[in-house]
């Protein structure tokens, strides 16, 4: 994506894939530095552990927001039930570049369960929104971002419309 999509460095769609027992794969310990990883899971189950002592489970609808800053080593692996039983895995991971002044900040980890992520619907009931980061429909997310980011999971019924006001210099990814 490069300079044209700054601050976004990468967008990875994980799946959708259905794993048989014992087949699910993840990412064993590996380093990151100078950016944030935002993982949003739709199906399946993952577990996180890192060199800063953070750990957490990621279930459908949950968000993991890891700020690597000056550097962190972490792993993202299937939860035990995914390895034992198999199942459907689907989610997204976005890498967000940190501004130069923040690249050496201390690493941090935010694990936000689906139940803590605000949801709302449009007045006509045709648009459902989960406000992961930023603001939509006058609902503000609970996540603390280093740079202003808006991430909204939308479900729209037939005939629905939604307009989101954006500042003129915003980079946008629509999935």
Spans of features found by a protein language model:
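A short glycine-rich, His/Asp/Glu-containing loop-to-beta-strand
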Residues: 1-42, 120-163
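A short beta-strand-loop-beta hairpin characteristic of the jelly-roll/cupin
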Residues: 39-60, 75
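Tight coil/turn sites that cap or link beta-strands
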Residues: 61, 69, 157-159
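Conserved small/polar residues in nucleotide/adenosyl-binding loops
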Residues: 173-175
